[in-house]
Design a protein with these regions (language model features):
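Hydrophobic alpha-helical transmembrane segments of multi-pass inner-membrane transport and secretion
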Residues: 6-29, 290-326, 351-354, 359-363, ...
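Conserved transmembrane alpha-helices of multi-pass membrane proteins
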Residues: 294, 299, 374-406
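"Rare, low-scoring activations can occur
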Residues: 158-162, 191-295
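Membrane-proximal extracellular/periplasmic loop immediately following the first transmembrane helix
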Residues: 25-116, 121
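Transmembrane alpha-helical interface segments in multi-pass membrane proteins
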Residues: 305, 326-372, 387-391, 395, ...
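Short juxtamembrane loops and helix-capping segments at transmembrane helix boundaries
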Residues: 34-41, 362-390, 414
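C-terminal membrane-exit region of the final transmembrane helix in multipass inner-membrane proteins
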Residues: 1, 391-423
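Hydrophobic secondary-structure segments that place a key small or acidic residue at a functional site
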Residues: 114-220
Length: 423
């Protein structure tokens, strides 16, 4: 019959709409889930301090040759003067590690027969207090810094530790903190005094590279400035970074200008000087600009899908209900109540959407297992599929209910004589 043909066309349209809407909902779900994951560090009140070497053309430059030991001594003096400023809460040194800047080493870590790749970074113990990094067992940054106080010790992120303890990433019974105190093979040797087998002093919380990325696997090699094989030359200065955490009550507008003015002479050590100083918020905003642009674009596309789904379903069910005005009025004349008719129409709509949604779910699941959906930073899982499917179905049903309720309510007001005339 004509009604059957219309219903089949309606279900075909619902299938296309449901699949497209699920894809949009799945992306939004992944974004929301990732935003719930902790960043793993605190960038507020943290500043990057850039030490640089006076150019040879400068009248203040001492052109006498310097050994690496002498340059290292200058660098240590620069660092010590910096951290003793009254406004500085703590300072740290890093090599191959700069939050929001793609500056990393990498290596393969192994424990027994298990291996995993991870970002390799070198930091002083105070790094964990400057960036407020907590332990995987939720210990304070100060306690984590105390545990990681020996040169060549390693601190690994929890996800790295879990990979080294168990190859099954879905096994939640294995805790990363169990790796603390054990020895692993780092696979990376940046300094002469670094042994191949290193002790894991502590396990820290998982860390993201930025707010829009997934947790990264990373290992931190502990260095103590001035100890062991730690050496710096003028040529290597750009690769070494210093960060300070400023006391909250001192971190006010104009702080950088006043700090640089006050410390200009104090931080002139040998041929080293304070070249630049910027808050981490500067690097964060610069780094996240492209991510935000992409996110807003994808969210706009998702919103476009949702708006189109709403209009398509609204128009379809509205037209379908309007086409049955006479039938509904006749049912009223025959003794049906408005509530009965509302229930009938809602039931029909629910059934049509459900029948159309089943094949749409099959297609959606196959899109997921075929990696045709975004799997970074949130991995594909059956739970993700179920939640996305449920949210999509509820959206479809809510839109359909609105689309049915308004025209059905109008149809209830038709006069019996008009209904019988139309019949």
């Amino acid at each position: 019959s004509e009604m059957c043909i219309r219903d089949r066309l309606l279900m075909a349209g619902m299938f296309v709409i449901a699949t497209s809407l699920w894809y949009a909902v799945d992306y939004v779900y992944a974004v929301v889930v990732n935003q719930q994951k902790s960043l793993g560090f605190d960038w507020e009140h943290v500043y990057y301090v850039q030490a640089a070497v006076l150019p040879n053309e400068s009248v203040e430059c001492d052109t006498a040759s310097r050994s690496d030991d002498e340059v290292t001594a200058e660098y240590l003096e620069f660092y010590n003067r910096l951290q003793h400023h009254p406004a500085v809460e703590s300072a740290c040194y890093t090599l191959m590690h700069f939050h929001y800047i793609w500056k990393n080493g990498s290596g393969t870590m192994s424990y027994d027969t298990l291996k995993t790749s991870a970002m390799y970074r070198e930091v002083t113990p105070s790094y964990f207090t400057v960036f407020r990094v907590r332990g995987a067992d939720e210990c304070s940054p100060e306690e984590l810094s105390r545990r990681a106080s020996h040169t060549n010790d390693f601190v690994v992120t929890e996800n790295t530790a879990c990979r080294l303890l168990n190859p099954d990433i879905n096994n939640m019974t294995v805790k990363g903190v169990e790796l603390a105190g054990r020895f692993i093979h780092s696979g990376v040797s940046m300094r002469k005094d670094e042994p191949d087998s290193v002790r894991v002093a502590a396990v820290c919380e998982n860390q993201k590279y930025n707010e829009y990325s997934n947790w990264s696997k990373a290992v931190y090699r502990i260095v103590q400035l001035g100890q062991g094989d730690f050496k710096i030359s003028y040529g290597s200065i750009p690769y070494h970074d210093i960060f300070i955490r400023v006391k909250a009550d001192a971190d006010r507008p104009g702080f950088v200008e006043s700090f640089r003015k006050e410390m200009k002479k104090q931080l002139r050590v040998g041929n080293l000087y304070l070249a630049d100083m910027r808050p981490m918020s500067y690097y964060r905003n610069e780094h996240l600009a492209d991510y935000r642009s992409d996110l807003y674009t994808y969210l706009a596309i998702a919103g476009f899908f949702l708006a189109n789904a709403f209009l398509a379903i609204l128009g379809t069910f509205w037209f379908r209900t309007q086409q049955r005005r006479e039938e509904l009025a006749v049912r009223l004349v025959a003794g049906a109540t408005p509530h009965n008719l509302q229930t009938l129409l809602m039931g029909e709509g629910f059934l049509l959407i459900t029948i159309a949604y089943i094949p749409a779910l099959v297609v959606a699941y196959n899109l997921g297992i075929s990696d045709l959906v975004e799997t970074w930073p949130v991995e594909w899982s059956f739970t993700r599929f179920l939640i996305g499917g449920l949210v999509t179905f509820l959206l479809l049903w809510a839109i359909a209910a609105i689309s049915i309720w308004f025209p059905a309510r109008q149809a209830m007001s038709i006069q019996p004589a008009e209904a019988l005339h139309g019949e």
